């Protein structure tokens, strides 16, 4: 899916980050990982947050995001 803004075109990808401590850290980790292979990241939209639970305890926070980056033709 590509989104046009002005004279630019942006590509959107979905990523999920995980963290043992918080949703914010999970989102930060997802952006850091994505930025290693995607150039010119512009917007991160959080679409879902959940937790993984084992034996009645939270073991991971997960943040699902849509990331947009400038399309390079």
How would you describe each model-predicted region?
Residues 2-73:
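N-terminal, polar/charged subdomain of small-to-medium soluble alpha/beta proteins
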